[in-house]
């Protein structure tokens, strides 16, 4: 079923709105996927905040024209599903994780920070931990020296025969 001009303009406007908010674009060929598999992929994408859309490639090229994702326009050929995400790694991660379990979904290309990515680049981007994981790792690194100092002070207080609360006061007096 073909779309008339107004419907095409509406689709391009809708996708352009998602593109404007996105940091990452991931393209994958879905040839041979069943409807059930596509629905499962869409469900996973919704849970991760990824906008997935099957588009005509010409409409996708129009939607990304003038954006940082225009560099991926050369890769837009064949039956593709487009994944856009505000999180830097979410789109790549959702598509790569699904492709691991289903050989019919083939990662083709992507774009991040104005640079075109090949399939290996998208897989590398997908292997980066999410922002939340990176922040928790950073917090753990920052808390590690503080907790070590607290343990040393507690051990020092035990050696001197005092309480753990007295150790910081003694250390400050010294």
UniProtKB/Swiss-Prot annotation:
Q: How does it assemble?
A: Part of the ribosomal stalk of the 50S ribosomal subunit. The N-terminus interacts with L11 and the large rRNA to form the base of the stalk. The C-terminus forms an elongated spine to which L12 dimers bind in a sequential fashion forming a multimeric L10(L12)X complex.
The record lists the lineage as: Bacteria, Pseudomonadati, Pseudomonadota, Betaproteobacteria, Burkholderiales
Member of which family? Belongs to the universal ribosomal protein uL10 family.
Q: Does the keyword Transcription apply?
A: no
- The name of this protein is Large ribosomal subunit protein uL10
Q: Which InterPro entries match?
A: Ribosomal_uL10 (IPR001790), Ribosomal_uL10-like_sf (IPR043141), Ribosomal_uL10_bac (IPR022973), Ribosomal_uL10_bac_type (IPR047865)
Q: Which UniProt keywords apply?
A: Ribonucleoprotein, Ribosomal protein, RNA-binding, rRNA-binding
Its function? Forms part of the ribosomal stalk, playing a central role in the interaction of the ribosome with GTP-bound translation factors.
Pfam families assigned:
Ribosomal_L10 (PF00466)
Q: Name one GO cellular component term.
A: ribosome
- Organism, per UniProt? Methylibium petroleiphilum (strain ATCC BAA-1232 / LMG 22953 / PM1)
Q: A GO molecular-function term, please?
A: large ribosomal subunit rRNA binding
Output the GO biological process annotations, alphabetical, semicolon-separated.
translation
- PANTHER family to which the protein is assigned, alphabetical: 39S RIBOSOMAL PROTEIN L10, MITOCHONDRIAL
Work out whether the entry's keyword set contains Methyltransferase. no
